[in-house]
Each structure stands twice: as structure tokens, then as C-alpha cells.
Swiss-Prot record:
Its job: Allows the formation of correctly charged Gln-tRNA(Gln) through the transamidation of misacylated Glu-tRNA(Gln) in organisms which lack glutaminyl-tRNA synthetase. The reaction takes place in the presence of glutamine and ATP through an activated gamma-phospho-Glu-tRNA(Gln). The GatDE system is specific for glutamate and does not act on aspartate.
Catalytic activity: L-glutamyl-tRNA(Gln) + L-glutamine + ATP + H2O = L-glutaminyl-tRNA(Gln) + L-glutamate + ADP + phosphate + H(+)
Record lineage: Archaea, Thermoproteota, Thermoprotei, Sulfolobales, Sulfolobaceae
Name used for this protein in its record: Glutamyl-tRNA(Gln) amidotransferase subunit D
The gene coding this protein: gatD
Residues the record marks as active site: 102, 178-179, 257
SUPFAM superfamilies: GatD N-terminal domain-like (SSF141300), Glutaminase/Asparaginase (SSF53774)
Keyword Hydrolase: no
Protein's organism: Saccharolobus solfataricus (strain ATCC 35092 / DSM 1617 / JCM 11322 / P2) (Sulfolobus solfataricus)
Highest taxon of the lineage: Archaea
GO annotation terms (biological process): amino acid metabolic process; regulation of translational fidelity; translation
Family the entry assigns: Belongs to the asparaginase 1 family. GatD subfamily.
Length: 444
């Protein structure tokens, strides 16, 4: 199979009966390069794409190649011999639900490309150590990029979690893309109450075809958490540092992705992580004694009203533009990420007053992320309070947004909406901050 190659490169492969997925060796002068031939999607028809043993993909120009030869045909590789024991027919303890992302992807030996592991057997093949921890079962709910996540998908995930608990599983692992994983964690936390066990969201910052991949450690740590954690909460389980020593378990309504690419991108904000996972020792160590205990029966209440928006205040926010948004008849609620203790320009206060009188909920969070809103300190804050803006304590803006979607789907009366938004339902509000909750960056 050479259909992804064209021109001169195609002719060379055809003459040597080399196909994509074959192990080949290329000689250019004194340099010998060995790897798996991958599909080429380059417009240049004089390039071979090779996956090296170290996991990296490289392109090699056919110019000045002195020799190219097949080493091993893909069809001769007995991949079945790599399969490990799977608990077929046995009742699973941990359900792994895949929604997309790279966390449960694996290298496809036929081509060297990466694709999702679709079955329990493939996950065990990808990470056989799971068998040492628990009997697992896997389900692909859907496979989407996390930026395409929507409230209706949150409902489907919540329903699948409820079903998995009803089937007798004691813990759930949800594979998810990292970019919007914190949103989904919040949505599930409000949708699923009295959890019978941990619901662990896990993702990967580096795909499994890269030497620095965090996929295996994160997934293994998530299964350890789902198996041994004493809490019945929705959590996020991710790498804790740049090395591979341990992972951290973050409360789902107190976590945020704080770096675009680092493996330890996820951090607890205004709260301590619930636990750390020593994956080599297969051990979970609790770090936070304040957690929601497991209950006897999981309650499902998953519905959302997405007629909301998140307003990130900035100097110069146009009043007319804001007025157009506030007078949109579809809007039922607004979360403001305000400055400092919870402020916007005083120019906008009367617009907010009119909106709240019209029944629109307006909640205030802080752009600072760390710390809490206090609108009683300065004049502008007090004026915003008088205009009907509701301070939302130390809630993260994204968590407040998801919570508002959930609350609006359950209540119509503004006063009841306000009361629910300031009620600590699942740990989204931390009433007491200690000095150690704020990270200190060292430049020494």
C-alpha cells in the first residue's frame, strides 16, 4: 500500500515492494536510518516519512539516497502475541469512558500512526499494568476534539456515568481532551450527586507516539484513583511535575489548565489537591481531609441552559456594545470576570442595574483567579452590589459559568437563582483560604 505516495517516491517503493507500516532502512552516505514507513501527506513527492525508534517522525528526501531496503514486513508482526490477559466475562470494577483526546490513543503498528484505543483489550495492550489494579471495561461514548464539547455532550457523559455505577462499577475514568476538561469536570460535578465512587477525568498533554508522552502514567494514575480513593467526587487526575514521579488529583470544581503545553498544566486554585498518586507504588495518598464521602446511590440531574455568556472585563469596554449584549432577549445570565476584588468601570453600572431588574442574573468573579471577590471594600464594588450584581466568592469564572447553566435549567425566579449561585453545592466555594493555597514561583 503506497497510495499516499506519488511520483518518484511512489515508484521507488513500488519497485522494492515496500508498503506503509514496513520497517525499512535508508542509507545516505555514511548515515543509516531505520524506522517504520508512515503515510506521507506532503505535496513534495520526493519525501519519505519515517517513524524512528525514539518515537519521532522525520521526513527524508530521496535525493542522494544510496540504498533503501525492507527489514520487516508489517504482515509478519504477530501483534496478537502482545495481548495481555483481559478480564473477559468478569464483572468490571472500573469503567473507562472515552470522549476523545489523546489519552487512550495508541500507536497503530501497521502504519505507525496514532489512533484511539477502542476496546478494553486495546487499552490493556496499551497499558497492561492496569490488570494489576482492577478489572476494567471500556466504552467509546464519542470521539471529539475537546474544543467541540457542548452542554448536550455533558448530559450524555453524566448519563453514562450513572449507568456505569448502576451496573456495579465502583469507580469511573473519563478520557477527555485537556483544553475543556475543567468545564466538563464542573458540569459533571453539578449533574451527579451522592456519587458511589470517584469520577476521574484524565487527559494527556503529549500523544502516545512521543517519547515525552504522559498518556500512560496519567491513565494508570486515574485507574488507581478510581480504585482506591475514599471520596465520591468528580476529580481531574493529571501529571504533577515535569518529571514522572507522581500525579495529582484535583477537585473538579477547583481546577484549571494553567499552561498550554506543560505536562503539569493542571493546578488546583483556591484549594488543595485532594490526593497525590504514587503510580509506581500503586498508591494513593490523601492531601486534603475535606472531601465528599461515597454514598449508596448516584443521583443524576443533568440539564443545562446555555443562554449565558462570560464577560471578561477590560479597560475601554464599549458601553454601547455591552448594552447590545444585555438587551439580547435570549440572555438569561452573565458571569463577569472582573478586576481585582470584583470590579468593572462605573460607566456600566446602570446597564447592569437595568439587566437585573429585567430578571437577568449577573455574577461577579475575579480575573485574578486566586483569592476571592469582595465588593464591599471600594465604592465601585458597593455600587455594583446595589445594582444587583451577585459576588461569587472564590469561584473560578469557568466554574461559575457552568454552574449558572445548571442553575438556570432548574430555576426561573431571579432570587432563587441568586441563592443557588451563592450556595456551596459541591465544593466550588472554599470558605477559608490559607497562605499555602497561593503558589510561589521561584526564579533562583
Amino acid at each position: 500500500m503506497q497510495e499516499n505516495y506519488k511520483g518518484k517516491a511512489y515508484d521507488i517503493l513500488k519497485n522494492l515492494n515496500i508498503e506503509e507500516g514496513d520497517l525499512i532502512e535508508i542509507k545516505k552516505g555514511d548515515l543509516r536510518i531505520r524506522g517504520i514507513l508512515l503515510p506521507s501527506y506532503s505535496k513534495d513527492d520526493r519525501i519519505f516519512v519515517i517513524k524512528l525508534d525514539n518515537g519521532y517522525n522525520i521526513g527524508i528526501s530521496i535525493d542522494n539516497i544510496t540504498e533503501i531496503k525492507p527489514i520487516e514486513k508489517k504482515s509478519s508482526k504477530d501483534r496478537e502475541s502482545e495481548r495481555r490477559e483481559v478480564h473477559n466475562g468478569a464483572k468490571s470494577e472500573i469503567k473507562i469512558i472515552s470522549t476523545g483526546g489523546t489519552i487512550v490513543s495508541r500507536v497503530e503498528y501497521e502504519t505507525g500512526a496514532v489512533r484511539p484505543a477502542l476496546t478494553t483489550e486495546e487499552i490493556i495492550q496499551f497499558l497492561p499494568e492496569i490488570n494489576e489494579i482492577a478489572k476494567v471495561d471500556a466504552e467509546v461514548l464519542f470521539s471529539i476534539l475537546s474544543e467541540n464539547m457542548k452542554p448536550e455532550f455533558w448530559v450524555k457523559i453524566a448519563e453514562s456515568v450513572k449507568k456505569a455505577f448502576d451496573e456495579g462499577n465502583t469507580g469511573i475514568v473519563i478520557a477527555h481532551g485537556t483544553d475543556t476538561m475543567a468545564y466538563t469536570a464542573s458540569a459533571l460535578a453539578f449533574s451527579l450527586r451522592s456519587l458511589q465512587g470517584p469520577v476521574v477525568l484524565v487527559g494527556s498533554q503529549r500523544s502516545s507516539d512521543r517519547p515525552s508522552s504522559d498518556s500512560a502514567i496519567n491513565l494508570l494514575s486515574a485507574v488507581i484513583t478510581a480504585k482506591y480513593a475514599p471520596f465520591g467526587e468528580v476529580v481531574v487526575n493529571m501529571h504533577a511535575e515535569s518529571s514522572d514521579t507522581y500525579a495529582l488529583v484535583h477537585r473538579g470544581v477547583k481546577v484549571r489548565k494553567m499552561h498550554s503545553s506543560r505536562r503539569d498544566a493542571f493546578q488546583s486554585v483556591n484549594d488543595k489537591p485532594l490526593a497525590k498518586v504514587l503510580w509506581k507504588e500503586r498508591k494513593l495518598v490523601m492531601l486534603n481531609e475535606k472531601y465528599i464521602s461515597k454514598k449508596d446511590e448516584t443521583l443524576l440531574d443533568a440539564k443545562f441552559d446555555n443562554r449565558v455568556f462570560l464577560l471578561y472585563y477590560y479597560p475601554g469596554l464599549d458601553r454601547d456594545f455591552l448594552e447590545q449584549m444585555l438587551t439580547n432577549t435570549k440572555i438569561r445570565g452573565i458571569i463577569i470576570a472582573g478586576t481585582g476584588l470584583g470590579h468593572t468601570s462605573s460607566d456600566h453600572i446602570e446597564l447592569f442595574r437595568k439587566a437585573t431588574k429585567d430578571g437577568i442574573f449577573i455574577g461577579m468573579t475575579t480575573q485574578c483567579l486566586f483569592g476571592r471577590v469582595n465588593m464591599n471594600v471600594y465604592t465601585t464594588g458597593r455600587q455594583l452590589l446595589d445594582a444587583g450584581v451577585t459576588p461569587l466568592e472564590d469561584m473560578l469564572p469557568e466554574v461559575a459559568l457552568v454552574k449558572l447553566m445548571w442553575v438556570l435549567a432548574h430555576e426561573q425566579d431571579l432570587e432563587k437563582i441568586q441563592n443557588l449561585m451563592i450556595t456551596n453545592l459541591v465544593g466550588e466555594i472554599n470558605p477559608r483560604h490559607t497562605l499555602d493555597l497561593f503558589p510561589r514561583w521561584s526564579y533562583e
